Amino acid sequence: MEYTPSPKPQLSSRANAFSIAALMSSGTPKDKETQESTIKPLEQFVEKSSCSQPLGDISIVDSHGEFTNSPSSLCTEPLIPTTPVIPSEEMAKISCSLETKELWDKFHDLGTEMIITKSGRRMFPTIRVSFSGVDADAKYIVLMDIVPVDNKRYRYAYHRSSWLVAGKADPPLPARLYVHPDSPFTGEQLLKQMVSFEKVKLTNNELDQHGHIILNSMHKYQPRVHIIKKKDHTASLLNLKSEEFRTFIFQETVFTAVTAYQNQLITKLKIDSNPFAKGFRDSSRLTDIERESVESLIQKHSYARSPIRTYGDEDVLGEDGQTMQSRGSAFTTSENLSLSSWVSSTSGFSGFQHPQSLTALGTSTASLATPIPHPIQGTLPPYSRLGMPITPSALASSMQGSGPTFPSFHMPRYHHYFQQGPYAAIQGLRHSSAVMTPFV
């Protein structure tokens, strides 16, 4: 019996359209990426730009603060009025140069990144500029603002070690001008000194009330420096349309705002270049909470940076400006005499005795010849007011006089931890079995 194959079932037009043969035959090569989806370096930043009006041939400033004419595709709402487009003859004579340009060039070659936090973070490198061509008898106001480079959001590709476009930019944040706190400057001052914006802080907190510059993370920004000639009748900067000003842009100061460094080379360069970042060489192993805690401790407690600390009961000023007594601790007697003040009164350094410790010194009548073992084994010896260790003989005398008794638990010396750097400090505090006592 001869076998005859059954005819293939006929597919509907809809099913046939999704068949393998149809899909393979109808496939078309993908269009190449357009120039708008690629990252372009910042060519020029416009002095006059607006999102609501088309851009034409407008006057802009190059990296040396000189005006040139070139079109730009940037779309940014200007913070400073753009009239007059061409500066006056007097303002045209002013030139501005970027200090530490070599350092900025190193960061620019790698792709500068700036950390932004809720509380605000200072910039490094710092924008420092110097002016020439100003009138020595006139007064000038120096400002800075930071504007977006484009309308794109970026992401860092670790496998390519480069920044890629991740999509459209987030909605623009409130634009702010930072007026240099030393303004207004006289022309003579500007000729003799440079202007440093070291106190500028960057934040991602949209509700910031401290005057910090608000930025979006993973967006590229361009700082701009403005100089305004202050007129005699000008009382404030509320109306800048009638003022004479000039804007300076430096291409090497373009940066990407981030909440954590993406490029490890940027991290290394900042640590090597920033003298205040030496202690954070191993900070990458710290958690965010630990890093913020260490930074706040270093800022608030000055003795963490110095081996010498005054341990008196001096009055301190509270937040409301009223005088308040410093808080006590586990090492405070019933007469409100702290352990450190009592020890310093019996240490033999009469020139540094606390006034309240004179009564304790007068009641100490024991002999100084018989030393006793240290009362707290395995811990640091007591320190006097200047951080000097107390001798066993002086300690023996103080133990038999009128003063507090030593507790039986460990006494952590936080300032010794912090001398080793923030990472060593947090490791010492993390692995220590000591009873944590408050700072006094």
Curated annotation (Swiss-Prot):
UniProt keyword list: Developmental protein, DNA-binding, Nucleus, Transcription, Transcription regulation
State where the protein is found.
Answer: Nucleus
A GO molecular-function descriptor = DNA-binding transcription factor activity
Q: What does this protein do?
A: Transcriptional regulator that may be involved in heart developmental processes.
Report one GO cellular component.
Answer: nucleus
What is the designated name of this protein?
Answer: T-box transcription factor TBX20
Matching entries from CDD domains are given as: T-box_TBX20-like
Q: So which domain of life are we looking at?
A: Eukaryota
Q: What organism is the protein native to?
A: Xenopus tropicalis
